[in-house]
């Protein structure tokens, strides 16, 4: 269980990760102009990424490409297929993404669309030894609630897994979303132990005054924080990961507004310091 964080690839990022004590990076491929895409398009670019990571004692825990798979932009669709080819060359076995959603349809009516998109993707991934991990973020887009990712609750996970019936689809488990949705994230860890392929470490702070003013149907009554600065019980969470014999890695997903901009590095170091309390020393490398 190695500790890393989500970021675009760069030499500066790799050096910072090593200096701070991280053992891994989840490479963020979301942006069309991400440095990762520039590097892999060059001759020997993939090898240069591998070499830079190895020189600094780091591994790539996963590749993250989060978009609406059901209604993708053309570059996203093509980019995801490229990742299926790139991942094995980087010795990466997990690609993380969203399911996507037609926001005008119910969750149940999106399941056939999910099946149509993911059945061939999962077959291609299986042929290359790749697992696809779906992050459990609702990606809310206003009210009434629509969102662009249906995979936000255990009931829906069951519908998804039943629809495609593939061993290489699972979850990128993020407790921060489950917390404000009112779902027991510890019980969910236990219930879906065989389907957790990657973990995002992100905390949640409930802003009680705003919640009481706007109700649960309002916006902005919670905010995401670095691990240790919100209300997630990280000691219990990581203890449960050990209890269920989780074999993957953990990546901090930094969306903390207090430590944004120039304070980003300070925030990541703070998150590392907190989570390191609960991770066995031999598993940090």
Protein language model regions, located:
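Conserved beta-strand positions in the central sheet of alpha/beta enzyme cores
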Residues: 26, 62-64, 96, 133, ...
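Histidine-acidic metal/acid-base catalytic patches
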Residues: 1-24, 54-57, 91-92, 144-145, ...
């Amino acid at each position: 269980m190695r500790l890393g964080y989500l970021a675009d690839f760069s030499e500066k990022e790799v050096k910072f990760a090593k200096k701070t004590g991280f053992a891994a990076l989840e490479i963020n491929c979301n942006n069309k102009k991400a440095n990762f895409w520039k590097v892999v398009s060059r001759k020997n670019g993939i090898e240069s990424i591998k070499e830079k990571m190895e020189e600094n004692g780091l591994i790539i825990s996963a590749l993250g490409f989060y978009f609406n798979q059901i209604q993708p932009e053309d570059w996203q669709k093509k980019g995801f297929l490229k990742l299926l080819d790139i991942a094995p060359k980087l010795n990466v076995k997990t690609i993380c993404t969203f399911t996507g959603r037609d926001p005008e349809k119910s969750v149940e009516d999106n399941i056939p669309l999910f099946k149509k998109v993911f059945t061939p993707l999962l077959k291609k991934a299986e042929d290359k030894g790749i697992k696809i991990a779906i992050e459990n973020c609702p990606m809310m887009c206003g009210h009434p609630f629509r969102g662009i990712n249906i995979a936000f609750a255990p009931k829906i996970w069951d519908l998804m897994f039943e629809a495609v019936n593939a061993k290489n689809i699972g979850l990128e488990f993020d407790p921060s979303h489950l917390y404000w949705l009112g779902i027991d994230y510890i019980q969910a860890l236990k219930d879906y132990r065989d389907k957790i392929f990657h973990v995002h470490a992100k905390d949640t702070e409930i802003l009680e005054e705003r919640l009481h003013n706007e109700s649960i149907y309002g916006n902005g009554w919670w905010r995401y924080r670095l691990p240790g600065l919100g209300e997630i019980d990280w000691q219990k969470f990581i203890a449960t990961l050990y209890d269920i014999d989780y074999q993957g890695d953990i990546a901090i997903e930094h969306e903390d507004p207090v430590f944004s901009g120039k304070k980003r590095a300070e925030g990541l170091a703070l998150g590392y310091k907190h989570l390191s309390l609960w991770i066995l020393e031999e598993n940090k490398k």
